[in-house]
Amino acid sequence: MRLGLLSLLGLCAASPARGQSLSAADSARHVLNRLAFGPAPGQIDSVAAEGALRWADQLLTESRPADPQLAHREAAFSPRQFEADALAERLEEARRDRQRRQQADSGMAERQPPRMTNGPGRTLAEFQQLAVVRATSARDQLREVMVDFWTNHFNVYLDKGLDRALLPEFIEQTIRPKALGRFEDLLLATARSPAMLFYLDNVRSVRSGATPPQLARLEQPRRGRFGLGRGIRRDSLLARLQERMPTGINENYARELMELHSLGVDGGYTQHDVTEVARILTGWGMRQPNRGTGFEYHAWAHDEGAKTVLGVSFPAGGGEAEGKRLIQLLANHPATMHHVSRKLCARFVADDPPDGCVDDAVRAWQATHG
């Protein structure tokens, strides 16, 4: 969200609801609980003396302050471990960790003392500690609140396979840099995030009949002398790859994208729209972890046929660009503005937003282009 919309919500949070009369201390407590992670010692008195409206206005309109003390504390958590180029090592440890847990569950492994490693378990534990440090120590409380808000809005389940290793990067490299920016940019970033694409199975969503290049090469007839052993090994590898490869469209991400991330459950879309969105997003995948992960578009997997979403036509042959056009359509749809604005009002103003709050937020969204 641009700060214009947040400013409106912040001022609403600092103002008593109609028919209510709050003391200066109560107003200060309310705004600190909404725009920050609660009051620090002595802060209720200082905000009450300044005035909750004035404090909220300054918080939302001033430039984001440098925070050297927080930066010093963050450095203790080795931020590099949350970046993409450190992912291959974490994923290898995740694979070993998964094998150990599977063996333990099946009774095959002897009981062993916990191992302190740099794997996903330790990374997640440190990442959770870092979140607490930021929430309690950051001068820019609004950014931390928005990171928390968007992390919940664009939920990723950390106990699904690779997402144990991908989640920290998702929050640090996808959510955090865009937490105070335009919604369209954030929606696109999450749509291209390996954590999201893996969690909701879009990495396995391909057009019907699609054959990945590595499988196509193995399926080609070979000429020349071929030892029997090599031929058997090749056939075995081909069979394993064919068994693991996706075979068609997966609608999981398409449905969540519309129902939770943008339009809302009552956003006016149909099952046909879900299928068409899934077709548009075929080929949106991720690089292999041993190559550093990151978004990767697979043209071989994309459905190049014509599609229609919410009455809008997407001509045949649109490729990756039609996915970006889809995100733009969803991000700026009136239903999305209403759905996301209601959630923002519930977070920043009141659990049950007062009359007019959502409509005011939508108008601010329109005025600032999200």
Residue ranges and their predicted role:
Residues 2-13:
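Bacterial N-terminal signal peptides
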Residues 15-19:
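Sec/Tat signal peptide C-region and signal peptidase I cleavage site
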Residues 41-153, 158-169, 173-178, 199-203, ...:
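N-terminal accessory alpha/beta regions
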Residues 34, 59, 189-190:
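Conserved catalytic core of Hanks-type protein kinase domains
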Residues 20-27, 137-142, 248, 268-269, ...:
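Structural motif
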Residues 20-48:
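Mature N-terminal segment immediately following signal peptide/propeptide cleavage
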Residues 30-39, 134, 152, 259-263, ...:
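Short, hydrophobic/amphipathic alpha-helical patches that form generic packing surfaces
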Residues 127-128, 163-370:
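Active-site substrate-binding loop specific to GH73 endo-beta-N-acetylglucosaminidase modules
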